[in-house]
Amino acid sequence: ALDEGEDMISNDVVLRIIGPYGGFGLYEPSINGILSSCSGWATSARDCVKNSGEIPILSRISKYVHPNVAEMADYSAVVGGAVQCSTNLGARISNTTSFDTMSGSLSMLFGYAVSAAKA
């Protein structure tokens, strides 16, 4: 099996579960979903890091995923090389700091970005 953050090559074993299928088969779809989503997020972050040169990559993925998986998406992005993430829990489990930006809709509500920032 692979260690966390290690590059995957086609046909690599990424997780090995030993035991009767009846003991874990019920969880197979969830395990597959977690592995495929997390590896996809980490791979995307790694691609960004490789192509960014010296520019640090910050993960804002929490804006685009369901809130129940936002911290795992952030954690996966940090595993892939992002230096910060946008959820407090994602930052805690990845031992980084969180950051965020002001919502564009907040600026629209106030009519002007400076007014929204002051609020």
Segment roles from a protein language model:
Residues E4-M8, L15-A119:
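Buried, small/hydrophobic-residue-enriched core segments of structured protein domains
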